[in-house]
C-alpha cells in the first residue's frame, strides 16, 4: 500500500513556504495531540503529522523527498542545499546518509553530537532573476525589486507566542528535542534517538491558547518584500550578486538567509559583447576604403571619430582602447574592436560606370564590363538629368 503524500498529511501544496508548513503543523498537532484528543487513531495520526513535519521542515530532507518520494538511505543519493543549488560551497553534503550515522552511533555507543533544538539557525537562501537591458548591464543602475519571503512576525518578534506568553519546555522530551526508542534487532535490544513527536525537535512547545494570533505560533509570516538594488557596472549575462540577510527569516532568533540575484542581459542590436570587450561592424564604401576617410563609429560611450586609412581592406579590424565595458571593480574599461566591411555597389549610374572604367583603364585592367539593362539605362538617364 502506497504511503500517504507528506504534503497531503499536512494539507499544504507542494510549493508551500516554510511558514505555511509550520502553521499547518501547529494547527494539526494541537488538534491531534494525544493529551487533548482521545479518539481512536488520533495518536497514529499525530505521529504521522510529526513525521511529515520532520521531513518537510528540513531543507535537505524536503529536497530529497521531492526528488525521490522518500527520505533517508532509500534514496541512495547525495543531498543538496534544499531548494537553492549552485550558490553554496562546492562538495557533497551528507544527504541521505545522515540517518545511517545516527543509527550506527547509537548502536556502538558514540553518535554525533545532537544540535541544540533551541539554538539559532540561519534562514533559507533565496534566488531572484533580474533581466537587464544591454546598456544597464554595461553602466549599472539602481532599481527596486519585490519578492515573497518569510519574515519575522512583527507581533511576537519570532517567539510564536502572544504578548506576555512564552513557550515552555516540552514534557515529552524534557527540552532535548528527541526521545529514546528501544527496538529488538538481531544484535539484541538497541536504543536509538528519534525526533520528539510532541515538539517536532524544538524542545519547546507553545500551548494553542498562547499562540500568536498573527503567525499562529510559527514565529514567521509571509511578506511581499521590497528592496532597492544597486546593479554594479559591467555585469554580464549569468553573473550573480549576493545580498546578505535578504533571504528568509531564521529560526530561534537566527539570522536571515541571503538573496542571490542572477542577471540575464538582453542582447544588443548594435553591439556584441565578450566579457569587457565590445565588437562592432562598420560599413564603408569603395571610395572610403580606397582614398581613406573619417567615419563615426558607434561605441557604448557614444559615437567616436574613426580614421580609415587609404587602401583599407574589407574585414580590417580597428582597436578603440578604453571604449569597451567598464570593469566591475572600477579598474578602467575594456576595448572595442571595429570591423570594417567594404560594400560594393550593386548598381552604377552612367557617370559612375564611366569613372570605374576609366579607373580600370588607368590601372592597366582590360575590363569590358556588362551592358546595362533597360531599367538601368532609364535610371542613368534620370540621374544625369538631375
From Swiss-Prot:
Gene Ontology biological-process entries: chaperone cofactor-dependent protein refolding; DNA replication; protein refolding; response to heat
ZnF CR-type span: 140-224
Entry protein name: Chaperone protein DnaJ
The J domain, residue ranges: 5-69
Organism: Limosilactobacillus fermentum (strain NBRC 3956 / LMG 18251) (Lactobacillus fermentum)
Key words of the record: Chaperone, Cytoplasm, DNA replication, Metal-binding, Repeat, Stress response, Zinc, Zinc-finger
GO MF terms held by the record: ATP binding; heat shock protein binding; unfolded protein binding; zinc ion binding
Pfam families (alphabetical): DnaJ (PF00226), DnaJ_C (PF01556), DnaJ_CXXCXGXG (PF00684)
Binding site for Zn(2+) 2: 170, 173, 196, 199
Cystine crosslinks: none
Species lineage: Bacteria, Bacillati, Bacillota, Bacilli, Lactobacillales
Amino acid at each position: 500500500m502506497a504511503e500517504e503524500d507528506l504534503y497531503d498529511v499536512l494539507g499544504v501544496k507542494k510549493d508551500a513556504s516554510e511558514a505555511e508548513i509550520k502553521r499547518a503543523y501547529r494547527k494539526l498537532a494541537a488538534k491531534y495531540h494525544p493529551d487533548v484528543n482521545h479518539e481512536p487513531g488520533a495518536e497514529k495520526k499525530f505521529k504521522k503529522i510529526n513525521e511529515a513535519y520532520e521531513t518537510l521542515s528540513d531543507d535537505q530532507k524536503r529536497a530529497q523527498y521531492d526528488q525521490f518520494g522518500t527520505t533517508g538511505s532509500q534514496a541512495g543519493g547525495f543531498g543538496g542545499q534544499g531548494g537553492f543549488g549552485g550558490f553554496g560551497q562546492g562538495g557533497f553534503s551528507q544527504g541521505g546518509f545522515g540517518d545511517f550515522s545516527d543509527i550506527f552511533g547509537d548502536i556502538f555507543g558514540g553518535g554525533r553530537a545532537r544540535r541544540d533544538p533551541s539554538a539559532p539557525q540561519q534562514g533559507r537562501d533565496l534566488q531572484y532573476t533580474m533581466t537587464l537591458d544591454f546598456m544597464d548591464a554595461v553602466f549599472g543602475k539602481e532599481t527596486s525589486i519585490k519578492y515573497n519571503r518569510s519574515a519575522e512576525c512583527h507581533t511576537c518578534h519570532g517567539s510564536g507566542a502572544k504578548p506576555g506568553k512564552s513557550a515552555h519546555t516540552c514534557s515529552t522530551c524534557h527540552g532535548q528535542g528527541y526521545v529514546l526508542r528501544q527496538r529488538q534487532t538481531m544484535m539484541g535490544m538497541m536504543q536509538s534517538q528519534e525526533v520528539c513527536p510532541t515538539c517536532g525537535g524544538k524542545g519547546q512547545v507553545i500551548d494553542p491558547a498562547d499562540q500568536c494570533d498573527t503567525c499562529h505560533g510559527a514565529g514567521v509570516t509571509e511578506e511581499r518584500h521590497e528592496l532597492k538594488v544597486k546593479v554594479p557596472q559591467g555585469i554580464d549575462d549569468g553573473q550573480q550578486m549576493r545580498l546578505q540577510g535578504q533571504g528568509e527569516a531564521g529560526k530561534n532568533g537566527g539570522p536571515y538567509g541571503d538573496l542571490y540575484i542572477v542577471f540575464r542581459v538582453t542582447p544588443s542590436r548594435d553591439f556584441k559583447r565578450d566579457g569587457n570587450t565590445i565588437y562592432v561592424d562598420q560599413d564603408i564604401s569603395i571610395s572610403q576604403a580606397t582614398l581613406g576617410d573619417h567615419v563615426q563609429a558607434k561605441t557604448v560611450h557614444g559615437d567616436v571619430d574613426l580614421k580609415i586609412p587609404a587602401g583599407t581592406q574589407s574585414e580590417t579590424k580597428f582597436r578603440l582602447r578604453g571604449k569597451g565595458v567598464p570593469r566591475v571593480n572600477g579598474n578602467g574599461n575594456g576595448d572595442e574592436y571595429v570591423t570594417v566591411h567594404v560594400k560594393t555597389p550593386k548598381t552604377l549610374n552612367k557617370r559612375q560606370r564611366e569613372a570605374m572604367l576609366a579607373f580600370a583603364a588607368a590601372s592597366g585592367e582590360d575590363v569590358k564590363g556588362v551592358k546595362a539593362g533597360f531599367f538601368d539605362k532609364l535610371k542613368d538617364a534620370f540621374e544625369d538629368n538631375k
